[in-house]
Structures are given as structure tokens and as C-alpha cells.
């Protein structure tokens, strides 16, 4: 008897959760479409277009919010030409990885990698040593 009373509410809860998930995904895609990134050639793409060629095909949460893409975006939209850039860690190390304050680290590969590969097109940059094929004797 109690099960009969709870079942309709559980079904409604499942339906609402599925609707929330669907609406959230749709909103996220609309937000990513608003991130219009410019590269050194003057070409513009949104985050959905940039990440379409990646294995996951969709931008991860937080994509476009890191410092390097924001700094490059400002430079390219302000007629500036970046000469050099480096990222260093400041603050406490996150629990998920070891970071030392003041040390230089590469940009993250999942969020920034695809964005930076697009944005740096048209600049003379050194090859990314992390993307080189490993030497196998």
C-alpha cells in the first residue's frame, strides 16, 4: 500500500531529474556558443566548434574560464600581438594534484588544450613538448 503511494512520486521525481539534466545540457551548449574565441589570424570560433574535433566532442565544464585563453582573447580583440606567455601556480595546492607556488606549469590539456591550439594559430610558437610522440628505442 505504501509502495503504491510512493511510486507515482518517484516516477515524477525521475521525470523531473531527467528534464533538469536535459535543460542543463541545453543551457550549457548555449553558453559555450557565446564564448566566441579569436585566434591570431583573426578567425573566430565558439567553444562548441573548437571542441567538436576532440574525442569528447563537447567542451568540459569551465572551458574558456582559464587565464591563458582570456589573456589571448583580450590581446587579439585589442590589436595586441603576444610575444611570450607562461603560467605559474599561486596559492595552495589542490587536493587532486601536486602544485608548488611559484613553479611554472603547462596549461591543462582537457580544457585549455583545444582552445589554445586554435587561438595560437597564426603565431610563431614552439611545438608543445607534451604532444610529441615518445621516442621508442
Region locations from a protein language model:
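Catalytic cores of nucleic-acid editing and processing enzymes
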Residues: 1-137
Amino acid at each position: 500500500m505504501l509502495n503504491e503511494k510512493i511510486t507515482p512520486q518517484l516516477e515524477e521525481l525521475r521525470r523531473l531529474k531527467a528534464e533538469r539534466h536535459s535543460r542543463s545540457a541545453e543551457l550549457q551548449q548555449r553558453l559555450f556558443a557565446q564564448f566566441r574565441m579569436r585566434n591570431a589570424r583573426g578567425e573566430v570560433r565558439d567553444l562548441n566548434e573548437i571542441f567538436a574535433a576532440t574525442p569528447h566532442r563537447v567542451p568540459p565544464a569551465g572551458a574558456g574560464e582559464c587565464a591563458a585563453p582570456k589573456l589571448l582573447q583580450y590581446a587579439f580583440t585589442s590589436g595586441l600581438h603576444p610575444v611570450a606567455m607562461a603560467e605559474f601556480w599561486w596559492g595552495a595546492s589542490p587536493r587532486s594534484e601536486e602544485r608548488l607556488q611559484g613553479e611554472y606549469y603547462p596549461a591543462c590539456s582537457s580544457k585549455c588544450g583545444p582552445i589554445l591550439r586554435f587561438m595560437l594559430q597564426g603565431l610563431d610558437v614552439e611545438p608543445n613538448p607534451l604532444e610529441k610522440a615518445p621516442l621508442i628505442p
